[in-house]
A protein has these predicted regions:
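Helix-loop-helix hairpin linking two adjacent transmembrane segments in secondary transporters
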Residues: 108, 121-180
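Extracytoplasmic gate region of multi-pass secondary transporters
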Residues: 7-8, 199-244
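Conserved MFS/SLC helix-loop-helix module at the cytosolic interface between two early adjacent transmembrane helices
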Residues: 38-86
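Extracytoplasmic
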Residues: 1-22, 104-108, 220-228
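Central cavity-lining transmembrane alpha-helices of secondary-active solute carriers
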Residues: 27-46, 244-256, 355-358
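C-terminal ends and interior cores of transmembrane alpha-helices
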Residues: 61-82, 276-305
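Cytoplasmic helix-loop-helix junction between adjacent transmembrane helices
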Residues: 86, 90-130
Length: 402
């Protein structure tokens, strides 16, 4: 989560390296999430061949390489080699994305398995998400402090955050190396099983659900940050604190999701949170132009500063409560009753995370054409689909024998 969420504040830095559009500023997100399209199925094959532990270790090594390449891009001369710097950074983001895909493929089915599937499996996935949200909050606050004045920020300013990310990977590698993990028996991943998995209507619609869900989870904080810095002129340090609230809301939501996950069905969860997302985003878009004071920190003097922000921004931030349970609940519903297709289904599921890159491109294009606030219609459309999936698309019409 810490590494993945570096992409949004890095987009703020990139956007101020020259006359760059919102579409181009999102290259970190493109590289990070397109990697899922490339690695989704191969990651499932790695798990099948090497098991969870070795696959996780492979992913951590790959991630470390990606972080180092991004760090190298910050050492290059931006003024004379802007295109080359972007290319090197994009390669680093892509390689880091390969790592994220591998680790997600390991963690989600493992948690679901340990919980025994069903509501208990969903509960464990939500608990895992708590740790994700904690790291995301830390990432935004740290990057806001490092960026400071966004107009003057360079990729090299993010070096401390990149080194922390590298340290996380190294520590995780050491811990996992000395941890005994019970490996379930893995059936070989056969590509011809893809057609079989996709023949299940609820799974096929669920993969599209993950595709659009990524547009909500990443799109909301991403474009709130770009709006407050580019259009509203707030300092990056304050905006980092503001956007961190979104991820803090996700943290709270995941605590709640973990506590009720065994009692409330995934279908009910998605019905409630997708409806709430639609309402919150629409309010954020059409809220009165009232401003309220929000505290920030001047990291140079360590003084509290107050900035006026639009009331509707708080509505966008509350969407974090909704997205907090979406991933686990969608995954839980989509793989229900797949039997022998579950392994390949996990790989397909991870592949569809590349939807974030697509949705970021679409929303960035809309933002360039009609403005940041109007671009949130993309988020509304994504939430409407998830509501459809919860009410209709997720119904299991047939089950595979276990």
């Amino acid at each position: 989560a810490f590494v993945t969420n570096l992409c949004t504040p890095m987009a703020t830095i990139i956007k101020n390296q020259g006359p760059i559009s919102n579409v181009l500023a999102q290259i970190g997100n493109y590289g990070n999430f397109i990697a899922y399209l490339v690695m989704g199925i191969p990651a499932g094959m790695l798990i099948s061949k090497y098991g969870y532990k070795k696959t996780a270790l492979i992913g951590l090594v790959v991630g470390s390489v990606g972080i180092l390449i991004q760090w190298i891009s910050g050492l290059m001369d931006v003024d004379n080699n802007l295109g080359l710097v972007f290319a090197v950074y994009l390669i680093g983001a892509f390689i880091a994305g390969l790592c994220m895909c591998i680790l997600n493929c390991v963690v989600n089915p493992m948690l679901n398995l340990l919980g025994g599937g069903g509501n208990s499996g969903n509960q464990l996935i939500q608990i895992g998400g708590v740790f994700n949200s904690t790291a995301a909050v830390a990432c935004y606050i740290l990057m806001g402090a490092l960026i400071g004045d966004a107009a003057k920020a360079k990729i090299s300013d993010a070096t401390p955050a990149l080194m922390i990310a590298l340290a996380i990977f190294v520590v995780a590698f050491i811990v996992i190396s000395f941890t005994k993990i019970e490996e379930p028996k893995q059936a070989p991943v056969q590509l011809d099983l893809i057609k079989g998995a996709m023949s299940y209507r609820h799974f096929a619609l669920g993969t599209l659900g993950i595709f659009v869900y990524m547009g909500i989870e990443v799109g909301v904080p991403n474009f709130v940050q770009q709006y407050l810095i580019s259009d509203y002129g707030l300092p990056a340090s304050t905006v980092g604190m503001i956007v961190a609230v979104y991820w803090f809301m996700m943290l709270i939501g995941r605590f709640v999701g973990a506590s009720i996950g065994e009692k409330v069905s995934s279908r009910t969860m998605i019905t409630v949170v997708s409806s709430a997302t639609i309402i919150l985003v629409l309010f954020g878009m059409f809220a009165p132009t009232i401003t309220v004071a929000f505290p920030g920190v001047n990291w140079g003097t360590l003084e509290i500063i107050w900035e006026e922000i639009p009331l509707g921004i708080f509505s966008f931030l509350l969407v974090g409560l909704c997205t907090s349970v979406m991933w686990g609940a969608i995954f839980n519903m989509a793989v229900e009753g797949l039997g022998k297709y579950t392994a390949i289904a996990s790989g397909i599921f991870m592949t569809m995370v590349f939807g974030c890159a697509v949705m970021m491109f679409i929303q960035a294009t809309v933002a360039d054409l009609v403005g940041y606030i109007q671009s949130f219609w993309c988020v509304v459309a994504c939430a409407v689909y998830l509501l459809f999936y919860a009410l209709i698309g997720s119904k299991v019409t047939r089950r595979e024998a276990e």
